[in-house]
C-alpha cells in the first residue's frame, strides 16, 4: 500500500522545475522527509527514467562536476496526477479510521 509514496513525492518535486538529485533530497528534507538518502532516490530515479516518467540532461555546475537534471515527461505528469488521486483517497480513509472513536 505504501509502495510508491517516495516515487510520488519525487514526481511532485520534479514537477516544480528542473532539479538534480541532491537538491531533491534537500527539498524533501525541508518537508519533513529526513529518512530519505541518495541511496534511496537514485535507484528510483533510474527506474522512473526507464519507465519514461522523467528525462535527464547533464549540465555544468558552478561548484564542480556536471550534474544530472531531471524533468517530468507528459507520462510523468499523468502519473503524478494519478498518484495525487490515490493519495487523496488513502489519506482520507486513514484519517477516517484514526478519528473514529469506536
Label each region the model flagged.
Residues 28, 32, 58-60, 74-76:
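Short, well-ordered turn and helix-capping elements at secondary-structure junctions
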Residues 1-42:
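N-terminal helix-turn-helix DNA-binding core of bacterial DNA-binding proteins
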Residues 78-102:
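Amphipathic alpha-helical dimerization/coiled-coil segments
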Residues 51-66, 71:
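Beta-hairpin "wing" of winged helix-turn-helix
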Residues 66-84:
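Basic, amphipathic "hinge/linker" alpha-helix immediately C-terminal to the N-terminal HTH DNA-binding motif
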Residues 42-49:
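Short, hydrophobic-biased segments on the C-terminal half of alpha helices
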Residues 16-20, 50-51, 76:
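Short, charged/polar surface micro-motifs in flexible loops or helix N-caps
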